[in-house]
């Protein structure tokens, strides 16, 4: 059997909102919204893959569209998801943050309860 590293941790969909101009609270601000794969576990697994290390990634995916997007990202990077958990009806871990016009975080919201599923393995 080929040596590998098992990474246990979260995979998140990171959603960032960045206003074009000075952030005006309690108002709608024109700007850009980006979606990127993230999560500490996923980022460690990604870095290991970039180093050529075989990775088995034990994480939890919900039953939503974010799960498929993140699962595809992990597979494209060559991670083995054979041990990953599918949580039907669960919300895939999501992190939403708003920055100011310079990119400094002003507010973050973390919806990561699905990661608690990993405790019960």
Task: List where the protein language model places each region.
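Glycine-rich phosphate/adenosyl-contacting loop at the front of the ribokinase-like
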Residues: 1-60, 68
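Conserved N-terminal subdomain of the carbohydrate kinase-like
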Residues: 25-28, 50-118
